[in-house]
């Protein structure tokens, strides 16, 4: 999927969110500024949670709760290793709602056996262009 702007990346997130349900784990990979948080904004917009979005860089996880859905937005970039993820009870969130995990490749062994990986990459010639690849992972 090609995105030409931040707004388009959010739109892709909104469309993707239509198929999500509690228990889904989505791993977002890509360099800083590649669109992971904008995509997450789109997912949150779909669920009517857009007013609260912030990157959880300093918190590790932000919780967005609504009566019919819980969305957990992780940023595990600052974790030393998977043990730290276990120490915060990270894996307990997997069954509580929908989990979006930025930099999830850093905690690969802590991830469930089945998850969705979304990779974001920037185009070197056009700073607004993003390539987004969505794949289902079964370990």
Model-flagged regions — what are they?
Residues 17-23:
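Phosphate-binding P-loop
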Residues 26-28:
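Hydrophobic anchor at the beta1->P-loop junction of P-loop NTPases
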Residues 32:
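The conserved Walker
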Residues 36:
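Conserved lysine of the Walker
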Residues 45, 91-139:
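Short phosphate-coordinating micro-motif centered on Lys-Gly-acidic
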Residues 49-64:
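Short beta-strand-centered segment that lines the nucleotide-binding/catalytic pocket of NTP-utilizing
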């Amino acid at each position: 999927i090609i995105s030409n702007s931040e707004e388009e990346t959010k739109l892709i997130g909104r469309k993707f969110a239509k198929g999500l349900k509690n228990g889904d784990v989505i791993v977002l990979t890509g360099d800083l500024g590649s669109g992971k948080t904008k995509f997450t904004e789109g997912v949150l917009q779909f669920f009517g949670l857009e007013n609260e979005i912030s990157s959880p860089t300093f918190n590790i996880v932000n919780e967005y709760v609504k009566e019919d859905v819980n969305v957990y937005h992780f940023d595990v970039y600052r974790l030393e290793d998977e043990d730290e993820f276990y120490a915060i009870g990270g894996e307990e969130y997997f069954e509580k709602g929908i989990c979006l995990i930025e930099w999830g490749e850093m905690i690969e062994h802590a991830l469930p056996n089945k998850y969705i990986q979304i990779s974001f990459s920037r185009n070197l010639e056009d700073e607004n262009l993003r390539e987004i690849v969505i794949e289902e992972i079964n370990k």
